[in-house]
């Protein structure tokens, strides 16, 4: 089963954007629920996005330095 990891709502503005700063996990790597997957930055803050479920990071859909908006799929976790 594949789980899409999406950029969550970052505040009151549904059109929020963030930049992928640094991937903390490589494709093919095992991850546990709650592990940090990627570091993100906005114009107001920096934060890490946690893994929603235990599995394997099968595919990164965005590169470091790319800007994404709320709801965009960042990666796929195979469970």
Provide a role label for each language-model segment.
Residues 1-39, 48, 54, 60-61:
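Acidic, low-complexity mobile loops and tails
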Residues 32-50, 69-79:
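Short hydrophobic beta/alpha edge segments that flank linear recognition/processing sites
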